[in-house]
Amino acid sequence: MMAVATADELRSLSGDELVDKLREAKEELFNLRFQAATGQLSNNRRLRAVRRDIAKIYTVMRERELGITGDPALVAGAADDDATQSERA
C-alpha cells in the first residue's frame, strides 16, 4: 500500500521514479475498486487518497513538461556542469 505522498516529495523524484509510482498507484486503485465492487473494501477513504496521489503525480509530470519545475537529476547535472565550467575558466 502506497503512502500518501506530498507534492514536494514527488518533485524530488526522477522521471522514472514518478512513472513507477504512478504505475503502483494505478494498480492499487484497480485493486481497491475491485474490492469495493465485491464488497470486501474496509476503508473507503483509501480510494480517495489514491486518486489524489495519482493526480499529484500527474501534476508534477505536467509541471516538468511545461518547464515550471525541472527533473532533479537533470537540475543536479546542470549545476555540476556549471561548476566545472566555472573552474575551467
Swiss-Prot record:
Pfam family, any one: Ribosomal_L29
Coiled-coil residue spans: none
Any one GO molecular-function label of the UniProt entry: structural constituent of ribosome
Keyword Ribosomal protein (UniProt): yes
GO BP, sorted A to Z: translation
Protein name per UniProt: Large ribosomal subunit protein uL29
Stored PANTHER family: 60S RIBOSOMAL PROTEIN L35/50S RIBOSOMAL PROTEIN L29, LARGE RIBOSOMAL SUBUNIT PROTEIN UL29C
Family under the similarity heading: Belongs to the universal ribosomal protein uL29 family.
Lineage top rank: taxon: Bacteria
NCBIfam families assigned to the protein according to its UniProt record, in alphabetical order: L29
CC per GO annotation: cytosolic large ribosomal subunit
